[in-house]
Amino acid sequence: MLDIQLLRSNTAAVAERLARRGYDFDTARFDALEERRKSVQVKTEELQASRNSISKQIGALKGQGKHEEAQAAMDQVAQIKTDLEQAAADLEAVQKELDAWLLSIPNLPHEDVPFGKDETENVEVRKVGTPREFDFEIKDHVDLGEPLGLDFEGGAKLSGARFTVMRGQIARLHRALAQFMLDTHTLQHGYTEHYTPYIVDDTTLQGTGQLPKFAEDLFHVTRGGDETKTTQYLIPTAEVTLTNTVADSIIPSEQLPLKLTAHSPCFRSEAGSYGKDTRGLIRQHQFDKVEMVQIVHPEKSYEALEEMVGHAENILKALELPYRVITLCTGDMGFGATKTYDLEVWVPAQNTYREISSCSNCEDFQARRMKARFKDENGKNRLVHTLNGSGLAVGRTLVAVLENHQNADGSINIPAALQPYMGGVAKLEVK
C-alpha cells in the first residue's frame, strides 16, 4: 500500500507516476475524501473543546447553587457526547473508504523502469547461451514427456483441465529439479529453507497484495459448519507465506538481510487465460515453484534485486539452458512491484523465450500492509523493503530441460549438475 502521507503531500506527482503504469488515480475523489476527513476532525476538535469547557463550569455552577444552569450544562455535555460518537462514526466511515481504496492502488514504478503499455514494450537486458541447432525434427515436451511418465489425461480425469499426473522417470526428474534448486539457494546463495502452509487466511494475502484486487485468481476453501464457516485460500506462490513471516514484527537491523526460500505447490485459477497455453505444462492450475524472498534494509533493495536475478540465472546456467533477461515496462509490471526483471528460457518447440522467473522489488509496499519493520541505528522503527523471485518455476524448467536436451530417439540428456539428484542417471530413455 502507498504511503498516505506521500499521497497527501504530492497528490499530482503520485497520480502522474501511477498513470505511467496505466492506473488512473482519481485525484478529485481523493481530495473530496480528504476534505471530509479534515472537516470531521475539525468538528471533533471543536466538540471536544466545548465539552471540556462546559464540564469545567458544571462544578462551579453547582457550588454556586445554580442547579438549573448546572443541569442545562450537563445536558449540553450529554448532547456533545452523542455528537462526538457520530463524528467518530463519520471519521471511521471515511477512513474505511480510504483504506479500501488504498488497498486497490498499485505500487509506484521506479524512475528507471521503461515506459510502455504492455509486454510488447519490455526491454531486453541480455541473452545468455545460444539456442541449440537440431539436426532432426524436434518434439515438444508433451510428446517427449508422455512416454517418460507425463500423464495429462490422468490429471484431467482426477481434477479437470490444467492438471497433470507425473510418474516414474519424469516424476523423479521433477523432484530432482526442485531439490537442486533448493540446494543451490541454501548452500551457495545463503537462503534459509522454509516449509510453510499451503492454505492461508485473507489477511495474509492482503499483506502481499493478492487481496482484495485479485480474488478471482485464487482458489479458496471453506472450513467449519454454517455457524463457524471461514474462508481460506490456497497459496498462489510461496512468496505469500515467506514474506508474511515478518508481518507485525520489528527486526533488529543487524539481522538484515533475511533470505528465505521454499519449495511449494502453487494454485492459480488462471482467470482470463482461457485458450492460452492449453497444451502441456506451461500454464497449470497447480504447479511447483521454488521461491526466493529477501527482507532488506531500504538502502539495499536494488542491490538485492540484482543479486536475486543472478541467483535465478545461476540455476539456468547450471542446467545449460539458453535464456534472456528483460526489464518489464511500466504497463506490464505486477501490482506490488516497483521494478521487475523477468527471466525467459528458450523453448525450442515454440521457437521463442518463455517466462520462467520473475524477480521484483516491492520496496515498502508490502511492508506497510504487513507492518513489517526494522529498528535502525538510531533506534527508530522503519519499514523494511521486500523482494521476491522465482528460483525457478519447476514445471517450466522441466519443459525446458526436456526440449533443449532432447535426442532424436526421444531420450533426454540430463545436465551434469542435475545427475547427482538423479542417482547418477545421465540420460532418460523410453523403456
Curated annotation (Swiss-Prot):
Example of a GO MF term: serine-tRNA ligase activity
BP terms from Gene Ontology: selenocysteine biosynthetic process; seryl-tRNA aminoacylation
Domain remark text: Consists of two distinct domains, a catalytic core and a N-terminal extension that is involved in tRNA binding.
EC top class named in words: ligase
Family the entry assigns: Belongs to the class-II aminoacyl-tRNA synthetase family. Type-1 seryl-tRNA synthetase subfamily.
SUPFAM superfamilies in the cross-refs: Class II aaRS and biotin synthetases, tRNA-binding arm
Organism, as annotated: Neisseria meningitidis serogroup C / serotype 2a (strain ATCC 700532 / DSM 15464 / FAM18)
Function noted in UniProt: Catalyzes the attachment of serine to tRNA(Ser). Is also able to aminoacylate tRNA(Sec) with serine, to form the misacylated tRNA L-seryl-tRNA(Sec), which will be further converted into selenocysteinyl-tRNA(Sec).
Binding residues annotated for ATP, in chain numbering: R268, S269, E270, E355, I356, S357, S358
Name of the protein in question: Serine--tRNA ligase
Coiled coil stretches, renumbered: none
Matching Gene3D superfamilies: Bira Bifunctional Protein, Domain 2, Serine-tRNA synthetase, tRNA binding domain
HAMAP family: Ser_tRNA_synth_type1 (MF_00176)
Subunit structure: Homodimer. The tRNA molecule binds across the dimer.
Reaction(s) this enzyme catalyzes, per UniProt: tRNA(Ser) + L-serine + ATP = L-seryl-tRNA(Ser) + AMP + diphosphate + H(+); tRNA(Sec) + L-serine + ATP = L-seryl-tRNA(Sec) + AMP + diphosphate + H(+)
Amino acids binding L-serine: T237, A238, E239, E291, S390
EC numbers: 6.1.1.11
Pfam family name, one: tRNA-synt_2b
Pathway annotation from the record: Aminoacyl-tRNA biosynthesis; selenocysteinyl-tRNA(Sec) biosynthesis; L-seryl-tRNA(Sec) from L-serine and tRNA(Sec): step 1/1
